[in-house]
């Protein structure tokens, strides 16, 4: 099944995808991770952090907590959405997004790939491979702002100057091409990591991002082995396909 909305716009949004009951246990595990992560990263957290990563590792969570997250990720309902975009899909990572401690800290337009690719490489990456964020809002939040279609096209001069903070522009400036997607707890937003986007701070922002990608070696290079399920855990998942694809490429 081809997801035509994603193909055209680079994202799609499902309101109320998860029930309060489905979120409750996951929220508890994520709070456990978040509390310990903050304690270990105080300076970073107090000065500029807006996200953490590798939630499924055994650094802060026990196996029971990790299994709960793996089950949440590998549910039939989520994987049906992922499979409409990626065939096959490989699990890549998890991230947690939250508000900066400093309420004056500004958000920033970016493409995920700009942090490890040159401008020419970024342009080439727009033709693949695809990486997607599956963002689950754990609380009501201002959401995210995206530039529709920018997963397949290069920046306009204004967009490029803004996300690179060049020629008098700043990465926090408003873009006329941006579209705000406000999110409430339980909403699901799937968007391309390659597109121009920015998180919007405020309220009790707390969002779990589950990243999937096409199984290309230079993308799966970023996967951490400690974030993957054991064989025993794998056997207890509804749809372990994305983990299985990743594990096959780790060998």
Residue ranges and their predicted role:
Residues 2-9, 15-121, 231:
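Non-heme Fe(II)-dependent double-stranded beta-helix
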Residues 27, 42, 188, 194-251:
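Non-heme Fe(II)/2-oxoglutarate
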Residues 119-143, 182-183, 211-215:
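Short, conserved beta-strand element in jelly-roll/cupin
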Residues 139-196:
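Double-stranded beta-helix
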